[in-house]
Amino acid sequence: MPNAPDVDGPLIPFGATGQYPTCQAASEPPGSEAHPLLTRIDPQHGLRLTALPCDLVWATTWMADANELIAPRISLPQLPVVIWPEPSATDDQDARRGLHWKTRTLVEWAAERPFIWVDDEITDTDRTWVSAHHPGQALLHHVDARQGLTDGDYITISTCLRTTPATVAP
């Protein structure tokens, strides 16, 4: 089953009052200095994500930069990246209805397979739309951007993975 995490919010927490801890990575990929918020990423996320029995794929606007700047920082291998289409009139209509701009693309990408989407911008509108338009099981898991992925989030994702039949990612 594919697990598609976003970066900003789930891996890089933001929006809370006060300071975030600074996490040191074993190695800093070239170009990291241009992204000071990368120090908020807990390197343990890499171990925890790779321990999940699923196929990881980036579902982020970081696109290829996620593999270049984030994956090495948290010891992840190069992952597939969901390619986002150019904005369209449909996206504008969806936004007016409260549907996240990633939702349609992720459902198309999943191609009827079960999938997990981890993001800080998921709403009930997205869940309702996916339930109506995706025949496979889907967990749309909202992460509090102020905290990023927590133990509770990993438990929820692990539970879903244990109770969903495995499939092959594209």
State what each model feature region is.
Residues 1-92, 162:
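Alpha-helical substrate-recognition element adjacent to the catalytic core
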Residues 66-170:
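C-terminal cap/substrate-recognition subdomain and adjoining C-terminal extension
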